[in-house]
C-alpha cells in the first residue's frame, strides 16, 4: 500500500453522492478532474479494519487489477490515504440484471441464454486468469447502463481467490447459502467448478424465476444441494427446451470433476446456436415469479441492513451461527465466509493444552509466558475470592507442583471454543487429571474450567479463568 501521507485521491478526484453502503465502506460517485470521467469510488475506513481485513482488501485489489473484460466491473485505481483506502471502479448505472428483467415487456429463453452467455464470458475470463469468484449470485450481476441491450457486469470480488491451474484445495467455507456447491458443503477441496455450480443455479432462476434448491431450514437446504436434489416440475418446465435443461444438468453435476467448465459451456448449442435452439416464446410466468423472488431478496437485505445499522453488529457476528443452530433461508442471499474458524478454534485448544502442560510440569516460566501478568481467576484454592496477578499461583508452582515427581496425565474433554471477534476467544472444557497417590494407587481428579484468551502482538495470552471441582494439585 502507498504511504499514509499520500493525497492522490483527494487531489485527482472529486466526490459526489452516495451510491451504496457496507459495514466498513461507502460507495460514492466521483469524477476524475483532469478528464471529466465518472467512476464509482469504494471508500474503505481502514482505521476500523483488523489485520485480516487489511489482507482481504489487498487481495481484492490485486485480483481486480488482473481482470480486464467488458463483462466485469473494472478497477481503474487503488489509492491509500490516511485512514482510508479508495478503490476506483467503473460506474455502472443499470442496476441489477434481475431487476431489469422484470421490467421488460418481453422476456424469452433466448434472452436468458444471452444473459448467461455474458455471465459465462466473465467467469471464463476469471478462470483463465486463475481467479475463482466464489460468490456468484443475482446481487453481483449488474448492468452497465439503463440502455436497452446494456452489457451484464460481474461485480464484488471480496471473496475471490487465486488458484494455480485446476488446483483443488480447501479455501474455507465461503459463499451464499443457496448458491453453494456440494463440495464446499462437504468441506472437500474445491476450485473453479464452484463458480460453474453457481451459474447453474442462476440459469435455473433465469428460466423459471425460482431457485432449484430451497428450504426454510438451512440444514435441509444443504442436504438438498449435497444430493443434487432438483427437478424440472410441470407446467413451467414443459415449455423449456431440452437443450436448456441439458446445460443446467451439466452445470449442476455433483461431481466437480465431471461438471462442465466455462469454455465448454460457451460452446453448448443452447448458447452458441441461440437463434435456432433457444425458444423465443415470451415467459410471463417466469417474470411474475422473478418479481416475487426479487422482493424476497430485497426484504432480506433490508432486514440485515437495519440490524447492522441499529444494533451495530458486524455482518460476521450475525452470520457465524453456533453449530447445530437452524437458520431459515430468509438470509439465503447473504454472503457468508468462514475461512479459518476451525483452524482458530484448534489454535485455542492447543494453547490451552500447552498451559496445562506447563502446570503439570511445574514450569512457572512457561506458565507466565502464556498468561497475562494481570490474569484474574476464580478457583477452589482461593475459596471463592477473585485472584489477580501471578503471586497466588507462584506459591503452588514453587511449593507443590515443582516438588511433585509423580507422573501426571491430563485429558481435556468436550472443549467448546467461542471466538469473540478477531483477537479474543473463550474455551470451556472438563479437565481430567490422572496421577498416583502416595500409596502408589491410581487416582483421577475432575475440574470444570473456562478460560478467556486474548491475542496481543500475534500471541495468545490467558487473561481470565474460572475453575470449579477439585483443586489441581494431586495429593
UniProtKB/Swiss-Prot annotation:
GO terms for biological process: regulation of neuronal synaptic plasticity; regulation of protein localization to plasma membrane. The modification Phosphothreonine is found at residues 286, 335. It comes from the Eukaryota. Autophosphorylation of CAMK2 plays an important role in the regulation of the kinase activity. It catalyses: L-seryl-[protein] + ATP = O-phospho-L-seryl-[protein] + ADP + H(+); L-threonyl-[protein] + ATP = O-phospho-L-threonyl-[protein] + ADP + H(+). Residues 13-271 form the Protein kinase domain. SUPFAM superfamilies: NTF2-like, Protein kinase-like (PK-like). The active site is at 135 (proton acceptor). One of its GO terms (molecular function) is calcium/calmodulin-dependent protein kinase activity. Its EC number is 2.7.11.17. SMART domains: S_TKc. ATP binds at residues 19-27, 42. Keywords: ATP-binding, Calmodulin-binding, Kinase, Nucleotide-binding, Phosphoprotein, Serine/threonine-protein kinase, Transferase. CaM-kinase II (CAMK2) is a prominent kinase in the central nervous system. Belongs to the protein kinase superfamily. CAMK Ser/Thr protein kinase family. CaMK subfamily. PANTHER family: SERINE/THREONINE-PROTEIN KINASE. CAMK2 is composed of four different chains: alpha, beta, gamma, and delta. The different isoforms assemble into homo- or heteromultimeric holoenzymes composed of 8 to 12 subunits. This is Calcium/calmodulin-dependent protein kinase type II delta chain. The gene is camk2d.
Amino acid at each position: 500500500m502507498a504511504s499514509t501521507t499520500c493525497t492522490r485521491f483527494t487531489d485527482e478526484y472529486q466526490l459526489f453522492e452516495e451510491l451504496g453502503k457496507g459495514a466498513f465502506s461507502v460507495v460514492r460517485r466521483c469524477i476524475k478532474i483532469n478528464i471529466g470521467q465518472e467512476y464509482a469510488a469504494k471508500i474503505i475506513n481502514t482505521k476500523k479494519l483488523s489485520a485480516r481485513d487489511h489482507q482481504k482488501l489487498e487481495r481484492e485489489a490485486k485480483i481486480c487489477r488482473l481482470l480486464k473484460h467488458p463483462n466485469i466491473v473494472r478497477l481503474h485505481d487503488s489509492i491509500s490515504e490516511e485512514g482510508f483506502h479508495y478503490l476506483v471502479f467503473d460506474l455502472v448505472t443499470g442496476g441489477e440484471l434481475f431487476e431489469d428483467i422484470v421490467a421488460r415487456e418481453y422476456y424469452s429463453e433466448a434472452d436468458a441464454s444471452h444473459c448467461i452467455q455474458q455471465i459465462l464470458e466473465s467467469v471464463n475470463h476469471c478462470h483463465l486468469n486463475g481467479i475463482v469468484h466464489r460468490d456468484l449470485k443475482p446481487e453481483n450481476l449488474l448492468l452497465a447502463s439503463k440502455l436497452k441491450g446494456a452489457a451484464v457486469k460481474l461485480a464484488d470480488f471480496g471473496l475471490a481467490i487465486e488458484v494455480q491451474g485446476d488446483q483443488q484445495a480447501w479455501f474455507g467455507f465461503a459463499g451464499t447459502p443457496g448458491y453453494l456447491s456440494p463440495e464446499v458443503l462437504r468441506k472437500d477441496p474445491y476450485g473453479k467448478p464452484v463458480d460453474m455450480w453457481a451459474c447453474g443455479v442462476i440459469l435455473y432462476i433465469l428460466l423459471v424465476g425460482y431457485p432449484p434448491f430451497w428450504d426454510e431450514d438451512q440444514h435441509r437446504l444443504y442436504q438438498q444441494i449435497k444430493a443434487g436434489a432438483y427437478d424440472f416440475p410441470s407446467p413451467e418446465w414443459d415449455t423449456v427446451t431440452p437443450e436448456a435443461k441439458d446445460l443446467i444438468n451439466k452445470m449442476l453435476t455433483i461431481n466437480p470433476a465431471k461438471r462442465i467448465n466455462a469454455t465448454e459451456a460457451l460452446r453448448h448449442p443452447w448458447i452458441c446456436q441461440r437463434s435456432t435452439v433457444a425458444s423465443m416464446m415470451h415467459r410471463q410466468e417466469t417474470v411474475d415469479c422473478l418479481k416475487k423472488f426479487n422482493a424476497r431478496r430485497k426484504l432480506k437485505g433490508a432486514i440485515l441492513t437495519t440490524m447492522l445499522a441499529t444494533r451495530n453488529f458486524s455482518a460476521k457476528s450475525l452470520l457465524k451461527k453456533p453449530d447445530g443452530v437452524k437458520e431459515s433461508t430468509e438470509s439465503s442471499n447473504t454472503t457468508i465466509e468462514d475461512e479459518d474458524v476451525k483452524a482458530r478454534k484448534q489454535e485455542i485448544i492447543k494453547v490451552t493444552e500447552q498451559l496445562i502442560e506447563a502446570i503439570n510440569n511445574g514450569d512457572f516460566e512457561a506458565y507466565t509466558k502464556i498468561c497475562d501478568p494481570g490474569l484474574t481467576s476464580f478457583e477452589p484454592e482461593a475459596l471463592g475470592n477473585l485472584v489477580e496477578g501471578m503471586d497466588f499461583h507462584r506459591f503452588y508452582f514453587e511449593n507443590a507442583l515443582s516438588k511433585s515427581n509423580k507422573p501426571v496425565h491430563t485429558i481435556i474433554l468436550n472443549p467448546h471454543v467461542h471466538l469473540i471477534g478477531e483477537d479474543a476467544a473463550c474455551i470451556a472444557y472438563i479437565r481430567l487429571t490422572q496421577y498416583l497417590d502416595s500409596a502408589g494407587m491410581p487416582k483421577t481428579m475432575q475440574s470444570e474450567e473456562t478460560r478467556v484468551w486474548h491475542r496481543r502482538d500475534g500471541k495468545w495470552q490467558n487473561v481470565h479463568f474460572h475453575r470449579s471441582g477439585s483443586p489441581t494439585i494431586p495429593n
